[in-house]
Amino acid sequence: MLLSENMVELPDDLEWDMIVLDIDGTLLDRDGIIPEMIHIVRELERNGIVVSLASGRTLPNITPIHQSLCISGFIVGENGGMVWDSAKGHPIRALADGSRPKEAAKWLGTQIEGLNPEGIESNRWRETEWCLTEIEDWEAVRDAIESSEWSDISVIPTGFAVHLTIPGHDKASGLRVALEQRGVDPKRVIACGDAPNDIPMFELVGFAV
């Protein structure tokens, strides 16, 4: 099975139950939803493969995309911190506490010249992590965190923002919860993404693109 003419061929030795798509850089570019991806998503759903979304975005940012695509899968937001499977009647679940990353961002604002601890606009809806605006020298943020009382905080650049997350909080942890709710074996799932924050879910599933 091909995702598209320009993408890799998926292994056909298993019957895949689900494809989980990252959003920014995978489903969307800076101009919006990639037109080819709309066709691919709808074709997958017609063929009985559930499409779900896993993103660093907040639920209010992801939900309109999910609805516009008319997909039957769930949402994993905030890099695994939020899980919502409305199609199956499951309530929204917050899997982490974002207060410590937010406090770390405030501290970083006192250490790195020009860094705005308020971060990106969507932080107003963010519950389980904190996001700084994308900066060229994100390693300076990482190095400052590693040598501070906030050394347990992970610093993850995505190309769109720099995420501050607590230990054990990643796309794999959220995806694992969402899959358990549906009784889906992770090894029968394909994950697609393009950034370092996608690596944990790649390691969880049966095939990664």
Predicted regions mapped to residue ranges:
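Asp-based phosphoryl-transfer active-site loop
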Residues: 12-31, 202
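Residue-level detector of anion-binding/catalytic polar loops
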Residues: 50, 207-208
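Conserved acidic, metal-coordinating active-site core of Asp-based
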Residues: 104-205
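Non-catalytic pre-domain segments flanking phosphatase-related domains
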Residues: 1-21, 184
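Active-site phosphate-binding/coordination module
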Residues: 30-123
